[in-house]
Structure formats: C-alpha cells, structure tokens
A protein has these predicted regions:
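Acidic glycine-/aspartate-rich tracts in secreted/extracellular proteins
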Residues: 29-32, 67-73, 168-172, 201-202, ...
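Bacterial N-terminal signal peptides
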Residues: 7-15
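Intrinsically disordered, low-complexity polar regions and short flexible loop motifs
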Residues: 35-37, 52, 77-136
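Aromatic-rich carbohydrate-binding modules that target alpha-glucans
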Residues: 21-59, 67-91
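Phosphate-handling architecture centered on phosphoinositide signaling
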Residues: 139, 207-477, 619, 623-643
Length: 644
C-alpha cells in the first residue's frame, strides 16, 4: 500500500512539474564517471595531468561546480568556492589559463593549490550554454539547495524519484540522505515528499528553528564567545596556574554568546583552564600578572561552567550548561578534530560529541579593548547533561561515567589509579564523573569489568561481550578511530576515552565506549606504543594487545569481519565518508568558513597550513594534495590491504 501511494504521488508530480532541459553530469574529477556515449574522453597524461576531450554536436550544460558563468573570459572572476560568490570568505582555488591549439581547439588548464587538470574542448562541435563549474573534488557538501537531492543544481522530478527510492529502501550515501531530509526534521519520511512537491510548485522550505544543543552547535553558524573577567579574577587564574599547571579551579566572569546577531549574556559563570600536555598560561610567564600595555596573550584551552556559582535556569544557553573552548594546538590545518567528530557522527557513531567552530574574545577588567583570541573549537562536554541528552539511546542516564586517561587506562590493572572527581587538581587514570557519592560501588563494577576482559575464556568472553555492549557500534567506533589515525587512544596508548555503564547493577549493564580528544590525527603521527606510522600501521594490529578489550574482540572471525567491513566502508568512494575527494571537499568548506578570522592577537597560529604537527615523525603527510603522501590515500591503501 505504501509503495502504491508513493507511485501515485510520483505520477501526480510528473503531471504538474515543468519539463527540464537535459543536463549531462561530466563527473567530479579524474575519478568521475566520464561518459563516452556523449563524445567525452579523458586521457591520463601522468604527473597528475588529465586531458578531457569533448565532441558533442548539441548544446550541453556543463556541471563542474556551484558558480554560474556565461563567458569563459570572465571565468577567473566568477569561479569561487564558498558560501557566497561575492563573499570575502570565498577562496580562489583555480587559476584559469587559455591556450590556442590546432584545429581551433582550446585547452583550459585549471591550476589549483594542490592539483592540476587540463581540459581540451573542440570548439567546432561544442556550444556552451550557461555553465556551472564544480571544483574537481566536489561541491561544498554543507551548502545545497533544499530539495536538490541528486545535487544536479535544480529541483526536479528526478529528485522526487530518488526520494521515493530512498523511502522504499534504496541505498544512498550520507550526503544524499542529508539532502533527502527536505523539511529539516532530521529524518527522511513521506512528509519530505510533500515538502518537495511544494517546492516544485513554487513553494519554499521554512528555515528550521534551532533550539537547545542544536542552537549552540549549529554548523551553519560561526558564533562569537566573549569572556569578561575582572582584573583580580584574571590574576587569580594566572596564580592558580603557576601553583599547579593542571589546576581545575574556576574563577568568576561573564560570557556573551553571539549567534547570527542574537546575543545571550550570562553573569557569574565559572571559567577555568583545560588540557593535558596542551595546558598553557593564557598570558605572560611564571609570576607575571596582567599587563595592560603590550599584553603577551597565549592560546589556551578554557572550560566555561555557566552554573558553577549560580545554579538556576537563567544560567544556561538554551539549556546548555557547559562549553569547552579548545585552541587548535599543533593543527595548522585548523580541521583535525572537527573532521574526526563529524566523521564519527556521519558514520552513525551517536556517542560522538557535538562540535563546531567559534570566535573567542577575552576582556580583562580595566582594559580598553577585549583581546581577540581567534578561531577556537567549541566542544560539547561529556558529563551528566551529555548523558541526559542521549538517554533514550543509552537506556538510562543514571549510571557510572568514567574518564580514562594518562596513558594508564588500559583496562588491564584492577589495582590501578581509580578515583572520583573530588574537585581537586589531582588527575587519575580512571575518574568517576557521575554518581560520585557511590564511588565504592562504581569501583567494584569497573574492577569486575576489567577482570572479565582479562580472565574469561574465549567462549565465555564471546558470549559476555555481546551481552554487555553493542559490538557493532563499538567496532564501528574503533574503525573510525583507526581510520583517522588516532594513535593516542585506548588500544595503543591507554588514553583518551570515556566509559559509561548504564546500570549500577554489578553484572546486568551495557557499557559504551565514548571517543574523546582527536587533535593528534590525520597524519600527525608519533612513535608510540605499537606503532610509528599512523597512516600505514596495520589496522588489525593497531595497538598494544596488553590493552585487551579490542584485541580480544578481534580474535573472533565474525567480529573481525564486522570491523574490516566498517573500515572499508569509510574509504570507499561514493560513501561520502573519508575517501580523499569526499574528505577534501569537507575540509575546504570548513577552511573557507574560518579563513578570514584566523589572524589573532596572540600572534600564534595565524595561518591555515596543510601539514601535521611539527613534533610528529611523519612531516610528509598532507590532507589537500593528491600525491602519494596524502594521508587519505595512504590510509585507504592500508585499509584495503587487509582482509578479515
């Protein structure tokens, strides 16, 4: 009945929809689907040079990107990549060079920052209409016209057909499913067909209202965060750092959160320093207090607790109580952590936190002006509110949440450093973050969990692990972790993750592995643990098997097959995950969004550069080129070389 209803809708739309001119999709780069049936041929000239020859005796609309031009002579001026062709945020990616060829052919050489293509057009047989040129690595995946599900530049009956196919169970990659959510309600249903029909008939899609967590972590926006701290409180923050660089103590200040012109001001909030090896003094050097003139500002991580000093409903931003403000330490590309968390969510790992970019200012009382700290990461804290927001998926938000770190959280030592968050500056391998008054019970549960990982025989472990966790979700999480090259993790370095047990029962619970801290990824590599190359390390032997959880799971053929399947899905072209072209399109979009705001008053990290951290052991890795040192190419080869 449902299928019949959808077919009736499609027939009605075809009856009323205007006819559309033919559009030939020529492809999305040297690996696109070129169409010989329409006289299109491509030759690989080597060294990254490709010649595209077109011989078509008809008018053709050329779909190469998202900008319109009717004259090749003004192509340089019109070809831009970004949210708005007239925006200063746009980035020129190509230099267009036109050269005369024999037989009235013209070669158009598109020289990008990282790639070079040569397209040859036979002008005797080809008539250009209004063209759209798509950057060879694909259009901006975050900027599309509502209803244009197939991304051909228009809303047409073909989009209705594709939407119906998806509703009937047809396959579609992540980006297509995002576009299929025409009404913006975060699911693809028959209501999207109704909205799509309205669009075809000249209607419009109302802008969805962002509320709560979606308001704060809205990836379409670039919010401003302004912190205001009195002189005494700022100097106290510096003194706390000098006494203990790992201080967890808060000072009092106020925050202004500005998004799309809407300002939220909250007084009496808590502000503290955060980070592990990245902890820094935000101004000056040891013993120095604030200098009003020639201030020596430094990038640092900050935590903001809106309810630290006043616990009421007014001390939230649409229900959000805490913010993590993270500078892009050792990430010249300004993209690694943003990419990783978005990839987790894109792959269906719902335990991944929300994150976005923001711009940060700090004002110290008495100063004439506030200091611009530049572009920061705006991260969702993993705490009680994180659990409550995902209560339905976890099954309960009243269990035990553990923060696991310090390179000593291998789940292999029941006598290890296990404690609870007692509001001191002490740091532990395992810190209980919730239900701290029940620490003794929580500790027994964690120790029993460790013992079962280590001591159960294989048959019992196989049965038990499926009872206490979603094995598919865990292996998908770890597949993303390995694919992005996260060497500073649980398996390799006993570090950087959270565990959540959704029940206080000692035996009847489900545990969830929560990924955390992904700045040392995407080619930032280090000789550590079991590996010295985060791009080429065998994904089946990623870490130290003394950290037994993942190693024991992968001993079983069926679990190992699931893990390999998830890895290969991530790097397969067409899935819109982390094959090179899909990854580069997203990275360029993010960088275009923030490019004009990088320069800042700390004088640090003032340019976007395509390179890993300077202290890494593989400085050759890049993200935006197409050569043999491209991290996405290297990682895909390493994954495709394995089998279950």
């Amino acid at each position: 009945m449902r299928k019949f209803f959808l077919l009736i809708i499609m027939a009605l739309v075809m009856a009323v929809a205007p006819s559309q001119a033919a559009i030939y999709m020529v492809g999305s780069g040297p690996f696109g689907n070129w169409d010989p049936a329409h006289g299109i041929e491509m030759t690989d000239e080597g060294n990254g040079i490709y010649t595209l020859t077109i011989n078509i005796g008809e008018t053709v609309w050329f779909v190469f990107a998202d900008k319109l031009t009717s004259d090749w002579n003004d192509f340089n001026a019109n070809h831009r990549y970004g949210p708005d062709g007239n925006s200063s945020q746009d980035v020129h990616l190509f230099e267009i060079v036109k050269t005369q060829k024999a037989n009235n052919n013209h070669a158009y050489k598109f020289q990008g920052a990282n790639e070079e293509y040569t397209f040859t057009f036979n002008l005797n047989d080809l008539t250009f209409k209004v063209e759209t040129f798509v950057e060879p690595l694909g259009p901006d995946p975050f900027d599309f016209t509502a209803g244009d599900i197939n991304a051909d530049g228009e809303v047409s009956i073909s989009d209705v057909s594709l939407l119906i196919d998806i509703l009937l169970g047809g396959s579609a990659n992540y980006d297509v499913r995002q576009r299929a959510d025409v009404n913006g309600d975060k699911e693809v249903t028959i209501a999207d067909i109704s909205q799509l029909i309205d669009l075809l008939l000249g209607g419009s899609v109302p802008e969805p209202v962002k509320e709560g967590y979606d308001y704060v972590w809205d990836d379409k926006a670039l919010p401003e965060v302004h912190l205001d701290v009195s002189l005494d409180e700022w100097n106290r923050l510096l003194t706390l750092y000098d006494a203990n660089s790992f201080t967890a103590q808060y000072v009092m200040g106020s925050i202004s959160f500005v998004k799309n012109g809407e300002v939220t001001v909250i007084d009496s909030v808590g502000i503290r320093l955060k980070g592990n090896t990245s902890r820094r003094r935000p101004e000056g050097w040891y013993g120095e207090m604030h200098h009003r003139d020639n201030t020596d500002w430094h990038h640092a991580h900050f935590g903001v607790n809106l309810r630290k000093f006043v616990d009421d409903d007014a001390h939230t931003i649409q229900g959000v109580r805490k913010l993590h403000l993270k500078w892009f330490k050792d990430d010249p590309a300004y993209v690694r952590e943003v990419f990783c968390y978005e990839l987790f969510r894109r792959a269906g790992v719902w335990t991944a936190i929300r994150d976005n970019y923001c711009r940060l200012w700090i004002h110290v009382g008495g100063d004439t002006n506030e200091a611009y700290y530049g572009v920061y990461g705006l991260l969702e804290p993993i705490d009680k509110r994180y659990l409550k927001d995902r209560k339905e998926r976890f099954g309960s938000n009243n269990g035990y949440l553990w923060k696991c770190r310090n390179g000593a959280a291998g789940l292999n030592n029941p006598n290890g450093d296990i404690w609870y968050d007692d509001d001191t500056d002490d740091r532990h391998a395992y810190t209980l973050e919730t239900q701290t008054e029940e620490f003794d019970s929580a500790r027994v549960q964690l120790v029993n969990f460790m013992n079962k990982i280590s001591s159960l025989n294989d048959n019992d472990f196989y049965t038990w692990i499926q009872q206490v966790t979603d094995v598919d979700l865990l292996l998908k999480t770890y597949a993303v972790n390995v694919a992005v090259g996260m060497w500073d993790d649980y398996w390799n370095n006993a570090n950087n993750y959270y565990l959540y047990f959704n029940s206080k029962d000692q035996n009847n619970y489900r545990f969830f592995f929560i990924p955390y801290d992904y700045d040392n990824t995407l080619g930032t590599s280090l000789r550590c643990g079991n590996q010295d190359d985060a791009g080429r390390q065998n994904p089946l032997h990623w870490g130290n098997d003394g950290n037994k959880l993942i190693a024991r799971i992968l001993k079983f053929d069926d679990f190992r097959a699931i893990y390999v399947k998830h890895l290969q899905f991530l790097v397969t072209q067409g899935n819109a995950m982390m094959d090179r072209q899909a990854a580069q399109a997203r990275i360029r979009s993010w960088q275009a969004k923030i490019a004009d705001y990088i320069d800042n008053e700390t004088g640090e990290d003032t340019a976007i550069e395509d390179k890993p951290a300077s202290w890494g052991n593989h400085s050759e890795y890049n993200l935006l080129k197409s050569n043999s040192d491209n991290f996405f190419n290297v990682k895909a080869a390493s994954i495709n070389a394995i089998s279950p």
